[in-house]
Amino acid sequence: MNKISKIFFFVLIFLNLVSCNKSKELKNNSFELSGTISNSTQPHLILSEVGKSGFTQNDTIPIDNKGKFSKNIEMTEPTLYSLALGEEYIIICPMVGEKITIRATENNFAGSYNIEGSAESELLKELNKENYNVRLSLKSMSEELKQADSIKYDSIRTNILEKYISTKQYQEKITTDFINNNPGSLTTLIALYRTFDGIPLFDYRQSLEMHKKVLQSLEQTLPDNQHTLILKNFIIEKEKTLSDNGATKK
């Protein structure tokens, strides 16, 4: 091979490498979602955007016969997504340019998943873990009450009620701490709307102060984001409702 041929050969290799790298690069308005689902029988994951009217399906992500999946997702602004596998789902909060990796098992998708490559989504994972543990505690209390001996029922019921109140106070604390420790993050919206045994932790009918606190921080970081505007309109609407109800009672 002469000198010119060698130069031409190396130029071709270089161009090929550049081409390969470009194909893997993310667009300016996208993020990468990949990972593995162990023991998967589902053909795909469903990615839905969390918005004002609930979940809006955004994309379907195929899962191959080895349980692996990978897809680049375009997004127009920071937002929240639901990632569903069968009947279970998790919430993620990706940012443009992130390469997110998720590993989970199919039979306990929401409880088993691990996530890397997305700081906001990792925060949600920790919040979800605490919420999952609270649900297990409530389930355990319910089972204990069902199996209680009729003779000892009253004392067992009193004991469970004390546990119930303590568990609620614990969830209120960790949820409030999460909001206080992550001001301006979209993840605080998930904390804001957390429920305990089906009842909102921060019920707007009692107080809108926590809603206003979350909004104040979001208006500093994401003033024009759809989620900020939705929360703002929600507060305005509920304040009017509360005001009208107060006037009616008078």
Residue spans for each PLM region:
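Bacterial N-terminal signal peptides that target proteins for export
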Residues: 1-8
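A non-transmembrane, solvent-exposed segment enriched in polar/low-complexity residues
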Residues: 20-173, 177-178
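Helix-turn-helix repeat elements of alpha-solenoid scaffolds
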Residues: 165-172, 204-212
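Structural signature of alpha-solenoid helical repeat scaffolds
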Residues: 179, 183, 203-206, 223
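Amphipathic alpha-helical repeat scaffolds of TPR domains
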Residues: 184-198
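Short coil/turn linking the two alpha-helices of tandem helical-hairpin repeats
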Residues: 196-203, 243
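N-proximal helix/coil linker or "cap" segments that precede and/or mark the start of modular domains
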Residues: 210-250
